[in-house]
């Protein structure tokens, strides 16, 4: 199930069956997969240094950090960054070494979704932002986040896992890169897309 996720991700409980390199064809397609006049964003646990810098009119790929140090290093290198924080780190804004960690607004307000976040410009879709977006750990495995034991991925348990497994079992005649490139063309003007509710950009074994 975690085949496209990096084996090094601390939230990944199945590193032995996970990716050790990026699917470059898929990454190229993903960066271009933006609806016309729309917005697209996603997250990756792969080392930010192995992913091209974000560009205008391309998908915003956020480096998803597992530790504060990772988050600060990524942010200070000019990367759009998110941080998966322990479930106890619930403040709206944290200031760490002069950098703001802004909690996802949807975690505090049930009326906010990705679609209406930031008045139509979702925080995670914004490039060249001066803050890190913080996601407080949630789900059945939330207490594992920030601990030495690997695990804590929110998509592992609950309803998300059913869709994830079903998607993984689907048979297709073309690569994910081709399928994504064709699918994005079918979306209406101005659509917003959050790629990868689960999974990553790794080359599946």
Regions found by a protein language model. Give the residues of each.
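Class I S-adenosyl-L-methionine
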Residues: 1-205
């Amino acid at each position: 199930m975690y085949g496209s996720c990096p084996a090094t991700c601390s939230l990944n409980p199945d590193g032995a069956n996970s990716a050790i390199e990026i699917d470059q064809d898929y990454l190229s397609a993903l960066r271009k997969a933006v609806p016309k006049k729309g917005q697209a964003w996603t997250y990756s646990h792969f080392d930010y240094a192995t992913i091209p810098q974000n560009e205008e009119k391309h998908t915003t790929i956020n480096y998803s950090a597992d530790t504060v140090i990772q988050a600060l290093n990524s942010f200070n290198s000019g990367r759009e960054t998110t941080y998966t924080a322990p479930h106890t780190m619930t403040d709206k804004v944290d200031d760490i070494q002069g950098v703001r960690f802004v909690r996802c607004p949807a975690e505090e307000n049930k009326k906010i979704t990705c679609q209406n976040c930031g008045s139509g410009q979702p925080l995670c879709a914004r490039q060249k932002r001066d803050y890190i977006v913080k996601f407080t750990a949630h789900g059945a495995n939330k207490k594992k986040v920030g601990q030495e034991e690997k695990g804590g991925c929110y998509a592992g348990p609950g309803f998300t896992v059913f869709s994830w497994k079903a998607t993984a079992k689907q048979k297709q005649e073309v690569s994910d890169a081709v399928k994504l490139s064709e699918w994005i063309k079918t979306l209406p003007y101005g659509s917003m897309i959050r790629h990868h509710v689960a999974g990553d950009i790794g080359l599946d074994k």
